[in-house]
């Protein structure tokens, strides 16, 4: 690979969770408890290794991602330390922080609410 090229690999995941935004005024739809089907993608970048010609073993990625997703799945996000204000942006930061040490080469975490057509992407650099 050349200096101008970078190889990226991604792993998708999903979780179901509820949240609310207590800082919104009464009557605002987000102030009430509501839930979403969330989807996410983690992206790693690097050079394929000589041993297996991959950037990172997808099984290892899946294992790390599943561990973090399980902390979110079927939970009230507001009750999770660090997600007291559980916006898409905050969820992306939460996931990134918990995977950063486990997945060398992590460059981005994307969190989506597909039914709403919304997403937030936290990208290194």
List the predicted regions and their residue ranges.
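Charge-rich, low-complexity N-terminal segments
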Residues: 1-125
């Amino acid at each position: 690979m050349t200096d101008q090229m970078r190889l990226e690999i991604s792993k998708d995941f999903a979780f179901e969770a509820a949240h609310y935004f207590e800082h919104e005024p009464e009557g605002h739809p987000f102030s009430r408890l509501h839930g979403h089907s969330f989807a996410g993608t983690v992206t790693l970048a690097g050079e394929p290794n000589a041993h297996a010609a991959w950037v990172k073993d997808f099984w290892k990625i899946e294992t790390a991602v599943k561990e973090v997703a399980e902390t979110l799945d079927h939970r009230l996000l507001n009750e999770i330390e660090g997600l007291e204000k559980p916006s898409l942006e905050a969820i992306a930061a939460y996931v990134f922080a918990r995977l950063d040490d486990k997945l060398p080469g992590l460059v981005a975490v994307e969190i989506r609410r597909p039914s709403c057509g919304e997403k937030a992407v936290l990208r290194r650099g």
